[in-house]
Amino acid sequence: MKVLLLEDVKNLGKAGEVCEVKDGYGNNFLIANQKAKLATNEVINKYKAEVKKKAEKEALEKAQKLQMVETLQTITLTIHKKVGANGSLFGAITKEEITERLKEQHASLNLDKKDIELKHPIKSTGIYEIEVKLGSGVVGVFKIDVVAE
């Protein structure tokens, strides 16, 4: 019996492969546990179409992320904070605060706090480079300017 694997199966094959298996193993284990489907032309064509659609969707998402990174690199985000006598901020600037200010000043950019990578806490005024990891290997950098109120 030929089956189309829906997920990786140890000692048999990887997802998307068509494998020849014994009837009992195919029916009682693979198909019953939804690890495979009977490999008919219709099932194979449907699976290929789903894979193609998924790849197109991922390519579109990656293109949108790359465009967002290009936009981010042109931005300098300004954050006004109260400063103590020694020049340090009252509290550190957090990822949440950066995303809120970004939404206020640039509404078209919608970043989540988990996308922002802070190497160390921002506790004084100055210009800092903030790294953004958007997934799919897309990484960008933008600047924030911390100014005393």
From Swiss-Prot:
Presence of keyword RNA-binding: yes
Pfam family, one: Ribosomal_L9_N
Gene Ontology molecular function terms on file: rRNA binding; structural constituent of ribosome
GO terms for cellular component: cytosolic large ribosomal subunit
GO biological process, one term: translation
Function: Binds to the 23S rRNA.
Similarity remark: Belongs to the bacterial ribosomal protein bL9 family.
PANTHER family, alphabetized: 50S RIBOSOMAL PROTEIN L9 (PTHR21368)
Alphabetized HAMAP family for the sequence: Ribosomal_bL9
Name of this protein: Large ribosomal subunit protein bL9
Organism listed in the record: Helicobacter pylori (strain ATCC 700392 / 26695)
